[in-house]
Amino acid sequence: APNQRLCGSHLVEALFLICGERGFYYSPRTGIVEQCCENTCSLYELENYCN
């Protein structure tokens, strides 16, 4: 999949889909907003935020 720009609820929904039952930590301090909203990130990078 190509890199995507995901912001707000779209970013949270993507994390739900990718992480599933593992859950994830969504905190602006982790840099996920800079990485995936201000820039683009891959599904592989999103998976780094799963628990």
UniProtKB/Swiss-Prot annotation:
Pfam families named in the record: Insulin
UniProt entry keywords in alphabetical sequence: Carbohydrate metabolism, Disulfide bond, Glucose metabolism, Hormone, Secreted
Record's function text: Insulin decreases blood glucose concentration. It increases cell permeability to monosaccharides, amino acids and fatty acids. It accelerates glycolysis, the pentose phosphate cycle, and glycogen synthesis in liver.
PROSITE patterns in alphabetical order: INSULIN
SMART domains with a match to the protein in the record: IlGF
Coarse class of the protein's main subcellular location: secreted
UniProt similarity note: Belongs to the insulin family.
SUPFAM superfamilies, sorted: Insulin-like
MF terms in GO: hormone activity
UniProt-recorded name of the protein: Insulin
UniProt superkingdom: Eukaryota
CDD domains: IlGF_insulin_like
Signal peptide start and end residues: none
Subunit details: Heterodimer of a B chain and an A chain linked by two disulfide bonds.
